[in-house]
Amino acid sequence: MNTILAFDIETVPDVQGIRTLYELPSSLPDDEVVLFAQQKRRAQTGGDFMQHHLHQIVAISCCMRWGQDKVHVGTIGEMDDGEEVVIAKFFELIEKHTPQLVSWNGGGFDLPVLHYRSLIYGINAARYWDMGDGDFGDSRDFKWNNYISRYHQRHCDLMDLLALYQPRANVPLDDMAKLCGFPGKLGMDGSKVWDAFHAGRLKEIRNYCETDAVNTYLMYLRFCLVSGRFDADEYEMEIKRIRNYLSAQTEDKPHWAEFVQAWK
């Protein structure tokens, strides 16, 4: 099986970036900086969702499937790793494995955020950005199939693909996962991440991000079934593989116990 990397990111408003752009004093508390930026955004758009470049990445979680029977779910980096380190490690993973990336709205959110944040830090991601003119042995192949072009296959944005690239047809991962019999979100969602981060609950955010990565992977497996990439037996085998993997983690990682219990 080709290496599959289903991923998800969690973000919070970039407090330092907001301070810089609006020349806010260092004495202003972080929560007030965020409130200021949200008010500005509401005045501009009617909503408080920050522009992509003002999202600080606090977690990147992956569900990776490779080789004959290998699967791993985890969050990149250690708890005390900064944003720059985590982003660099994500692109190093791509550099090492050249996986099939799978996301839900990754083209609309996750990857653009990663682009802007890696630009801020000056992170090298040559393999990821290869569009046929790189120095890798197979770079020529990337002219026709790369991570960047919307209709290429190295990155499969499932939401975009299933919506036939029509934004009005986009639907939430949580809805589709639950309709397909998968757990979906359990307790936390993106709107609660800033409050959790501000309260020091980074571990909870990382756990939530991991469940979103697995939900994304499960949706990809279902897509492989309906698109004919898997027959029914192959699909059931892959579903059983990831379910058994998660079940084996439940003693040490309670979020997987909750996830498996919620799985119909």
Short names for language-model regions:
Residues 2, 55-58, 62-80, 98-207, ...:
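Metal-dependent phosphoesterase core characteristic of DEDDh/y 3'-5' exonuclease domains
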Residues 1-116:
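Conserved non-catalytic scaffold segment of RNase H-like nuclease domains
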Residues 234-264:
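C-terminal accessory extensions appended to soluble enzyme cores
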Residues 17, 32-35, 89, 172, ...:
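Exposed alpha-helical structural elements
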Residues 26, 40, 94, 120, ...:
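Generic alpha-helical secondary structure signal
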Residues 22, 31-46, 209, 223, ...:
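Charged, low-complexity, helix-prone segments enriched in Lys/Glu/Asp/Gln
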Residues 34-42, 90-93, 132-137, 238-240, ...:
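Short C-terminal domain-edge/linker segments immediately following a structured domain
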